[in-house]
A protein has these predicted regions:
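Cleavable N-terminal signal peptides
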Residues: 8-10, 20
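Short, glycine-/small- and polar/acidic-enriched structural segments
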Residues: 23-161, 168-171, 175-181, 192, ...
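Sec/Tat signal peptide C-region and signal peptidase I cleavage site
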Residues: 16-22
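Secondary-structure end/capping motifs
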Residues: 223-297
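Pocket-lining segment of extracytoplasmic ligand-binding domains
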Residues: 85-86, 115, 158, 164-256
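Short, solvent-exposed loop/beta-turn-alpha elements that line the ligand-binding surface or hinge
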Residues: 47-55, 201-208, 274-283
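Short, surface-exposed acidic
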Residues: 10, 56-58, 152-155, 258-270
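Bacterial N-terminal signal peptides that target proteins for export
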Residues: 1-8
């Protein structure tokens, strides 16, 4: 069963909260991407939470979801943001709860800019770079192929880090690749690739968009500190407000926080490769649709 928290009715009464002791450290797993928590950090919003609860919030960066989930399982993280695949997997298999859907879309299948491939059906026999079967990109790729009446056996899969897809496309080592943002935006902004199909076209789940990134928390931490969890979710809505109202400032913050060149982040935001919505509640309908999608993809 996938545990979700609706509008942070945190499954425990606020009155049962255990006050954090002076300078307790809260480890928050993040990735170098367009996650709202990075905006909250760069804008100084986390300082208010630290002062209120007498804690220190430390952002710990991971390149992808699997090691992030391992760290959460080991108790090295109390809360994390990752792709929806790893986030849902954690909520299903670990003592953890999904508390927010913080980014929509993000993923796309790319081909070299000068490729003659114009549809997924033309990928038969193609060499496709992908992040591995444990990634959320894998089921998206499987569905895109199935929708084009192709099977995974009809293509050659090449496992690689998502950050390497643009390089592989540039040197023509692969015919196509599936990855997430900002790696998608990097390939587009640098003129290396173009979008063959995006995640919203493959699997629209929430308001016409794919669910790209989720925030999830260890159950023991949520039970002990529901107010902290509430504030760490609410601050992401505040960060999304900044993104929507002042995208230029948000782009500047992300550039400093994740090290990607400004044109890449600018492309992600202005071309809506990454999409943001103030309603970050993981509704039952959304999660049911997502899990059904994962099960169908195998």
């Amino acid at each position: 069963m996938i545990r979700t928290s609706h509008a942070i009715a945190l499954a425990v009464a606020i009155g049962s909260a255990v006050p954090a002791t002076a300078q307790d450290v809260v480890n928050f797993g993040v990735q170098p991407s367009t996650q709202p928590i990075l905006i909250a950090h760069g804008a100084g919003y986390l300082k208010e939470i630290e002062e209120k609860h007498k804690i220190k919030i430390v952002l710990r960066s991971f390149s992808y979801g699997a090691p992030e989930n391992q760290a959460l399982a080991a108790g090295e993280l109390q809360i994390a943001s990752a792709g929806m695949g790893p986030a849902v997997l954690a909520a299903a298999r670990l003592p953890a709860t999904l508390v927010a859907i913080d980014i929509l879309d993000q993923t796309a299948i790319l081909v070299p800019k000068d490729s003659k491939i114009s549809s997924v059906s033309e990928l038969k026999g193609a060499k496709i770079a992908y992040p591995g079967e444990g990634s959320q990109q894998y089921p998206l790729l499987i569905k895109a192929l199935a929708d084009a009446k192709l099977d995974v056996k009809d293509v050659q899969l090449f496992k690689t880090d998502g950050s390497q897809v643009a390089t592989l496309l540039a040197n023509k080592s692969v015919d196509a690749g599936i990855t997430w943002d900002p790696h998608v935006s990097r390939a587009l902004a640098d003129g290396i690739g173009r979008v063959l199909v995006n995640s919203a076209e493959i699997m629209p789940i929430k308001n016409g968009h794919y669910v790209g990134d989720g925030t999830y928390v260890r159950d023991d931490f949520m039970k002990a500190h529901p107010e902290i969890v509430q504030d760490l979710v609410s601050v992401q809505v505040k960060a999304i407000d900044l993104i929507l109202k002042d995208p230029e400032r948000a782009i500047d913050i992300w550039t400093k926080e994740n090290g990607f060149p400004r044109p890449v982040i600018e492309y992600a935001v202005k071309q809506k490769i990454s999409v943001f919505d103030r309603n970050i509640v993981p509704s039952k309908d959304t999660i049911d649709a997502y899990t059904a999608f994962l099960k169908k993809a195998g």
